UniProtKB/Swiss-Prot annotation:
Subunit text: Homodimer.
Species in which this protein is naturally found: Staphylococcus haemolyticus (strain JCSC1435)
Pfam families assigned to the protein according to its UniProt record, in alphabetical order: ACP_syn_III, ACP_syn_III_C
Gene: fabH
Residue numbers spanned by region ACP-binding: 239-243
Organism superkingdom: Bacteria
Enzyme Commission code(s) on record: 2.3.1.180
The protein's name in its UniProt record: Beta-ketoacyl-[acyl-carrier-protein] synthase III
Physiological role: Catalyzes the condensation reaction of fatty acid synthesis by the addition to an acyl acceptor of two carbons from malonyl-ACP. Catalyzes the first condensation reaction which initiates fatty acid synthesis and may therefore play a role in governing the total rate of fatty acid production. Possesses both acetoacetyl-ACP synthase and acetyl transacylase activities. Its substrate specificity determines the biosynthesis of branched-chain and/or straight-chain of fatty acids.
Amino acid sequence: MNVGIKGFGAYAPEKVVDNAYFESFLETSDEWISKMTGIKERRWASENQDTSDLAFEASKKAIKDAGITPADIDMIIVATATGDMPFPSVANILQEKLDTRKVPTMDQLAACSGFMYSMITAKQYVQSGDYKNILVVGADKLSKITDLTDRSTAVLFGDGAGAVVIGEVSEGRGIISYEMGSDGNGGKYLYLNKDTGKLVMNGREVFKFAVRIMGEASTRVVDKAGLQSDDIDMFIPHQANIRIMESARERLGIEREKMSVSVNRFGNTSAASIPLSISQELENGRIKDDDTLVLVGFGGGLTWGAMVIKWGK
């Protein structure tokens, strides 16, 4: 059985926050932010928008694109680090919003690697033969956990959501190879402060980890797929920082024009990062049926996930 993406959808909130916004209360500038991160603007959800609301908008599009109805969904997996509340899960809340059957629901917390973790998890369930249409969502409202007094992190984060329906696809298409991993020793470098409820990051250590693991994991999944770098049509890394992305691209040996860059528009949206990039490239006609994509993410934990996927239903 070939398992892949049967339907796709993404959503970014309407509010655009450009770099000039931060100049009024932080010692920073548009020039510095752009040079160091590649970010020009990001989207922030409104105060009355929860993560589940972002997930709902993306999910409706994915279900429609798959040519099915909510009644056909037989599992929901949401990757998020910013649930509406500790429980019930975002997946549970999303089930009600979509009015699906009483199917199993779960959230997966692997921070920015969450979308990769959830897609790989869904693949296993479909491969078992017990499930046919699994809704996987990467959604985060990072604006609610961003410390706006911290110059090093305040400018980085945005909000958004992306969703896919994972199921059986045509011969020769779908997920070809994948890898997941974690290193709990790095948990202290990127975490949510339990007292303040705000994100804390050791940028230098996270940068070192990300540069190494994104390149290594991407290379391994390409090798596992029996492919060469020349066989890759599009490289879609987690959109954390343009310098990290460029380093990973160089390690993989991919031409610059084959790398998706959406960090300039959305900032770091955690679990939504990779699907928002996919959405951009689909809109621009840069992803076509039977294209070979490499997706790779890293995040708090520290965690990582990568895959090679042949695009198409």
